[in-house]
Amino acid sequence: MAKQILYGEEARRSMQKGVDKLADTVKVTLGPKGRNVVLDKKFGAPLITNDGVSIAKEIELEDPYENMGAQLVKEVATKTNDVAGDGTTTATLLAQAIIREGLKNVTAGANPMLIRNGIRLAVDKTVEGLKKVSKNVNGKEDIARVASISAADPEIGKLIADAMEKVGNEGVITVEESKSMGTELDVVEGMQFDRGYLSPYMVTDQEKMEAVLDDPYILITDKKIANIQEILPLLEQIVQQGKKLLIIADDVEGEALATLVVNKLRGTFNCVAVKAPGFGDRRKDMLRDIAILTGGEVISEELGKDLKDVKVEDLGSAESVKISKENTTIVNGRGDKSAIHDRVAQIRGQIEETTSDFDREKLQERLAKLAGGVAVVKVGAASETELKERKMRIEDALAATKAAVEEGIIAGGGTAYINVLPEVRELTSDEPDVQVGINIIVKALEEPVRQIAANAGLEGSVIIEKIINSEKGIGFDALHEKYVDMLSVGIVDPTKVTRSALQNAASVASTFLTTECAVADIPEKDKPEMPGGAPGMGMGGMY
């Protein structure tokens, strides 16, 4: 396909137009008085959101050069979202500011490669300064503050803080859509997996259609049990002890299942059978997790163990097990604490090594089931449009909270960037163009406060001057339009989010400045449509 090529200033300016179109769309959402953006969807209702990355992903521009610029800045938002889960609007805004100031200097004759070096120096200094003032998240109150600011809703903040308190920092918190109007929290303590009883005759509570086993033995195997003779010696030992049994197997069918059900109905023996969770290698890992959690062994031919040789000592046990039609929950497994700890450490290592997002998510779920628990935030609203918007805000708040637990918190509302300005200004270089790069970051660091003020209908320059001349930590509360100690009133941002936003913005923007040529496809003109058939002409008698 034929290409069109733009050079130098013309190429950079065309791409900058695209950057501005995307950033100007996203930045109206910043701060407590930021507005929403409505996105048209091909199917279903339009989406109303203030999530920077969701807005950026929807933007495609007609002009190929403008679109190139927009796609580059879209990468800033996407990368920040991947790393920190929030801060995408700030990252987009910073990228726009660095590109705008950088292009002015490149046009004036500065060397973009040296400017890039200056930008890198200033960003490193800023990150160093942010880490110095960062404070650790202490307790539920700090978590609630971070989530409240991210979601712009104290109720959501409290909900996420409750969830984190119940499942711990290692726990998994998922967000689901609810059929009801309200938003509620559902916490699953212990290990839950999505497999229910194999026969409804196994239930112990007819009203709830659940089977609850107190202090049961747990047989864990990856084999299919069809012949009752295979496990008969084991069942006899368990009946003698008057205990209950949970069987987790590849499948229990035919004669074996019928025998277990008949004995349950007669009251001879209480046993529930469920299928093993997961598939393939993941199933083996999950069975091993259950075995370690309950202090049992996985009965598998791979490990040289046969069902007929199983003794009671090979079984796991737990305080209680609850089995519904769809889920099995093991509460307080009686496994060795040090073995569980070692398994958790092993999974953590795998999480760090994996490059697949899907694998990482599944490993984190396994980690949560072993180390903490699982909490589900069920989001409800009056309409589907509000539901989707609320769900996105909760997901952002959740990501911000996890980032805060990892690297701590700093003063919010762009205040932290202003607080590190004096240290960045101290950076000097004998090379004038490197100094230009440093000065670009100095100016860009003011941009978040300026935009938050603009979205509140105020003049940013006056506010920035006041913050610079105040003590560190004093910032501008745009919601109530007053100057406050940001940390003490709970206006905080996660250090990881603030750091990632600047690093990703600077990375893409400084590379953008080094562009000297842009190559794009020549848009195809619409081809004329095929002429239609003459009126009245049939298909020549063909059927």
Swiss-Prot record:
A GO BP annotation: protein refolding
Highest rank taxon of the organism: Bacteria
Region (Disordered): 524-543
Residues noted as binding ATP in the record, renumbered to the chain: 29-32, 86-90, 413, 477-479, 493
SUPFAM superfamilies according to UniProt: GroEL apical domain-like (SSF52029), GroEL equatorial domain-like (SSF48592), GroEL-intermediate domain like (SSF54849)
Cited Pfam families: Cpn60_TCP1
Key words, A-Z: ATP-binding, Chaperone, Cytoplasm, Isomerase, Nucleotide-binding
Compartments, record wording: Cytoplasm
EC top class named in words: isomerase
Enzyme Commission no: 5.6.1.7
MF annotations from Gene Ontology: ATP binding; ATP-dependent protein folding chaperone; isomerase activity; unfolded protein binding
A cellular component term, taken from the record's GO annotations: cytoplasm
InterPro entries: Chaperonin_Cpn60_CS (IPR018370), Cpn60/GroEL (IPR001844), Cpn60/GroEL/TCP-1 (IPR002423), GroEL-like_apical_dom_sf (IPR027409), GROEL-like_equatorial_sf (IPR027413), TCP-1-like_intermed_sf (IPR027410)
The family this protein is said to belong to: Belongs to the chaperonin (HSP60) family.
The protein's assembly and partners: Forms a cylinder of 14 subunits composed of two heptameric rings stacked back-to-back. Interacts with the co-chaperonin GroES.
Protein name listed in UniProt: Chaperonin GroEL
Organism: Clostridium acetobutylicum (strain ATCC 824 / DSM 792 / JCM 1419 / IAM 19013 / LMG 5710 / NBRC 13948 / NRRL B-527 / VKM B-1787 / 2291 / W)
Organism lineage: Bacteria, Bacillati, Bacillota, Clostridia, Eubacteriales
